[in-house]
Amino acid sequence: MSGRLKLAASFSILFLAGPGIACAQQQVIGAPPEAHNMKLVGTSDLQARSAYQPTIHHQGDRWIAYIGHHGGSDEIPAPVNPQTGKAEPNGTSIVDVTDPSQPRYLRHLPGQEGKYEAGGAQMVRICDGKALPTGDRNAVYMLRTFGGEAHEIWNVADPANPVLITRIAGLKDTHKNWWECDTGIAFLVSGAPDWRTRRMTQVYDLSDPAHPQKIRDFGLPGQEPGSTGAVPTELHGPISTGPSGNRVYFGYGTNKGGVLQIVDREKLLNGPREPTADNLRLPEIARLTMSAFNGAHTTFPMLGMPIAEFAKDKDGKTRDIVMIVDEAILNECNEPRQMVWFADITIENRPMMISNYTVPEASGSFCERGGRFGAHSSNESMAQVFYKKMVFISFFNAGVRALDIRDPYHPTEVGYFIPAITAATDKRCVKIDGKDRCKVAIQTNNVETDERGYLYIVDRANTGLHILEMTGPARAVAGLP
């Protein structure tokens, strides 16, 4: 295994030594973006709000981007909305991207007052009412977090005029969730007041969004109320394969002590619900425990992948793969490198790491650029245009990276895009001898794709939304013309 890991890393280094290498250190306003096999299609400044999660939804004959935001900063706790002329706490941006070259900003929906992680409305998921078992067929539902204290559901059938449907309140540290549109089951990342961890899972039936029904609380044994001893690392987020796949992949830890937990969905939903250690263990199939150096921010399943190298083998021609993405937390490399990992879970109770990927720091002097450098998240769309062929990883000051993962044992970078900074790009600071030393750099925070083959990246440092497309030989990896 160690040989494969080293090979994957060294292959990435060799690839990046080719054309288009990013070699500049400090970004300056007016300089062009740095790009290889990607090009800019369109932008929106998102009212200079710190952005977290983009979700792209095909809504009738339109394509709408719903973008969650972090809370405001010390300097600007509530930016002015040019559409209303009022200062509004960061919330949700709603942007029409039907023409990706000319995004139209439709609405800012304010979130919770508060700065950074204490405010905003970071997470967004969308389900059509006609897809949900008992939803209003004319509705389009947006599930979002509200600061750290609640989850909200809005009707965004008219995306410029959202209507609040309901709120699940009385929580803390709400964060990244997953919503199955065909069943209505939602895995809500929350902090329940009596649990021993900052974040765990609350499973809800949101098939009728106007009447949420709680199913159960879930987490790792030792996190539940009344338990003793060391508390296992907190949840970051789940991804479910729904009833057909009958699996939920939970990622615990963000930049340290990561755990991939593979869970039987049916047992999770229908097993005993009291949060005892035995009941929490019951639906678990396996865990993959990572190094103390690395977390599990995103756990993206790619099941039944045909491996060309194994095509003539009697067994194991296809493999079940989960991509695990860590999150860099600290500025200017003041932590272990946060990376991308690929796990083979074909033998579910014996998952194993098979490869990894990182951006070579020397390719852009990224530790000196300012802000965070390292992985954060991947696209989560399972649309066929890219699924099991190419993934996109946000890498903070190294922009977004495109990986050819058709052979997940040897992931290969095939493109990147680092946006140019603007006058809105916020500084990032570190303490040197007790004083702030600040630099301005892109902080590509999250990435998503749509069925048309466009990429959407958003910036944590207030630089807005960039809509991209693949160019050159990288398009062939996805089968794009």
Regions found by a protein language model. Name each.
Residues 8-20:
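Bacterial N-terminal signal peptides
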Residues 23-481:
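Feature marking well-ordered beta-strand scaffolds used for ligand recognition
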Residues 1-5:
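N-terminal secretory signal peptides that target proteins for export/translocation
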